[in-house]
Amino acid sequence: MESTTAFSEVTSALGIENVKIMEPFLWMLVLGFVIAFVLAFSVGANDVANSFGTAVGSGVVTLRQACILASIFETVGSVLLGAKVSETIRKGLIDVNTYNTTQELLMAGSISAMFGSAVWQLAASFLKLPISGTHCIVGATIGFSLVAKGQQAIQWYELLRIVLSWFISPLLSGIMSALLFYFVRMFILRKADPVPNGLRALPIFYACTIGVNLFSIMYSGAPLLGFDKIPLWGIILISVGCAVLCALVVWFFVCPRMKRKIECEFKSSPSESPLMDKKNRELRCPILKPDPEDIKLPVDGGIVAEVKVPILDMVSVSRTEERTVTFKMGDCDDAVEKEKLNSMETNIDQPMNGSVQLPNGNHVQFSQTVSNQMNSSGQYQYHTVHKDSGLYKDLLHKLHLAKVGDCMGDSGDKPLRRNNSYTSYTMAICGMPLDSLRNRDAEARPDEAEKFTVHGADGKKRIRMDSYTSYCNAVADPQMDVEAEEQEEGSIEDVATDRKSSSSSLEERHDQDKPEVSLLFQFLQILTACFGSFAHGGNDVSNAIGPLVALYLVYESGDVTTKAATPIWLLLYGGVGICIGLWVWGRRVIQTMGKDLTPITPSSGFSIELASALTVVIASNVGLPISTTHCKVGSVVSVGWLRSKKAVDWRLFRNIFLAWFVTVPISGLISAAIMAVFKYAILKK
């Protein structure tokens, strides 16, 4: 008798007796592990977009780089910060004491909750809708508990908090993100030279990023790192100290290096000629030679004509098969008035000694090969001055017809073609027709030539024009204005459409960050995304394996109220499933968060990341219900609306909000259906 009692005590201490009791339910444990992996996969496919969606959308990182970084930080965060996941299901939403004598029902409920949450998250990922994984698992838990024990086991106050979070999370985070981006735009982006203010604000941005994210991670109280033993004042002191130290390092080391890099890469760029100093112009652009003396060009019969160039003398190197233009320029503001001449008729079919004097006083000298190709047939071609060329701002100040490689320092630059906007604009100013060149190119490429011609009512072919070609036409031939007016009268709707699209393009381009501003915010956005991914791995791994932890601990101990620590390998199991889901299907929701909802820039992306993280920290301490997904979506929409009211896809936002609204009911219904099958068909309770 004593030996039997001693054996029972030993087996009870080792947990062998409990294992034997729960052994008939081993199949439920195996099924739970399979479904938990699917749930982790769905969390990775949907929720991870919260961290790196804006970084991918702004172009700071590629999708592959985002997946690599997220895999590292999600896994590390899930292992180091996710040790509290066993409390999520067992003590958060339901009263586990009601399952003391029916452990198998709690195990079946955990499987049902994971299945319901996984199905709805996968469906949302397929629809490219970001939803809250926490709300999914909460709805599924409520669903199975209603079937198993009725209303007595549910804490309805938690459901009320979730409903409030639908409105509090996006609204609060959106306001904070909009305020932060408003100050960034006012004091940095809208300045003529945003670099000085950006460098001054850089230490503050880094300090806030480090401080907010460190506090968020330490306040989670991860027992594996000992954060649960640090008091609140200690967490605040450590966070502030690290933030100040980071600010000093950035101010004394990062800012000077960043300033030199910006000056080297952007300030001396030949495409931004107003920013070039005299030395850079002479070194990078040898064909642009300022000369205070007059330029003398040979005209007919060896006569030398003097042309004064008050702004900048343009001398191009004489080479075979190249065209050389030297002209007289005045102030760009009244250039149109100066070039209104009585007659624009010029015969350039018979140039004398390879040069000609144009009606506006300009002298054009070109090789014999080019002059032979200039056969006027009464048809002109002009090309739009493209806004992206980098020459738009100073196009009226400089003029040359050499190759781009002569002016651009990079070896990979392409030479100018005849249909290049810079060349065509130059020809328009000089009054040189390009009809023969166009005809020759049309014979070689008839399909492309047809794109640039329109047929008028009189049967004549006219070159398609838009608002940017009007100046070229006015300078080259006043008669072209008449044809342009006739075309405008005949196609008012087309002109209005082009003008609308042009204004939209200008507005969108105006909202883009300058290259030097992007450089300032790029690493900041990557840093905030990595911190967010690390915290996400510790927080949302509970959504993936919280029910699995409850299932495993109940099977192992036979007690629903066990206080056993969460095994590390279970956390790693959930982290691996999250990463696989991100790699396989994460791009869908990332596209919604980073591109489809509204365009993202590095500056706006940083504002979204930092403000949403700050919102989560503040709301958690105050006790307000919050959702990281809802915070991020609210920040994206508010910043996008502040940048441009037309930039937000409001239909997509409506669909996302509807998905939030139905998340709890749908996941709860699916979980309740599975639980009903377990209870009445399998367990027969």
Curated annotation (Swiss-Prot):
Biased composition (Acidic residues): 482-492
Pfam families: PHO4 (PF01384)
UniProt subcellular location: Cell membrane
Membrane topology listed for this record: Multi-pass membrane protein
GO molecular function: sodium:phosphate symporter activity
GO CC, one annotated term: plasma membrane
Entry keywords, A to Z: Cell membrane, Membrane, Phosphate transport, Symport, Transmembrane, Transmembrane helix, Transport
Biased composition, class Basic and acidic residues, residue ranges: 496-513
Annotated transmembrane regions: 25-45, 66-86, 106-126, 162-182, 201-221, 234-254, 517-537, 565-585, 606-626, 656-676
Catalytic activities: 2 Na(+)(out) + phosphate(out) = 2 Na(+)(in) + phosphate(in)
Any Gene Ontology biological process: phosphate ion transport
Function: Sodium-phosphate symporter which preferentially transports the monovalent form of phosphate with a stoichiometry of two sodium ions per phosphate ion.
Annotated family: Belongs to the inorganic phosphate transporter (PiT) (TC 2.A.20) family.
Protein name as catalogued: Sodium-dependent phosphate transporter 1
Organism: Xenopus tropicalis
Lineage: Eukaryota, Metazoa, Chordata, Craniata, Vertebrata
